[in-house]
Every structure is written in structure tokens, then in C-alpha cells.
């Protein structure tokens, strides 16, 4: 697969970004050829105990489980939800009987730690 095809099959939209003295928080929605993934990313700031470890809290829906739900509908829902976004998104999916996977992952920057 060449670069042009990959770009056509991948989409990413920023939903929100928030920063305080502890960390920077990023909220994104990504579309892959076979799934849609909502990510809440937390990046602790320098001087914080978890500095150098990025946390990704993800909800993944395989395309075959979307039923009639579209990427654009999910994006609109997430952009209009301000607090407890992940929890409300999971409730939204459960009410529509949409199968999803939710997991917390992390990445360690060995150059920092």
C-alpha cells in the first residue's frame, strides 16, 4: 500500500485539548480502514511523578459493529459532550447495542525516564 492510499484510509480529528499544571490532555477520534478509535491521551508535565509516560485511554469500534452509525455522527456526539466524555460515549454505544473494546495503554519515553 502506498502513502497516498494510506492517507485516504486514515482520518484523525481533534476533539479537544486541555492543559493544567499537571498534564496536557488530548482528545481525538481516528478512522482506520477497519475501525474507529476514540482516544483520551494524558501527557504528564516535566516534574510530575509520571513524566515521560503517556497514557492512552481508548474505545475502539470495528466497522462491522457500527450498524448504521457513522464516523461523522460519532465525531458530532463527542464534540458536543464536554464532561465525562468517554463514559457518556460508552453509554451511547451500549444503548445502541454496539460492540466495542475499551482499554488503557501507556507509552514510556526511555529518553526521559
Name what the model sees in each region.
Residues 5, 42, 56-59:
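Intrinsically disordered, low-complexity regions of eukaryotic proteins
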Residues 50-113:
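Mixed-charge, Lys/Arg-enriched low-complexity segments
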Residues 44-47:
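Short, surface-exposed beta-strand-loop junctions and turns on beta-sheet-rich folds
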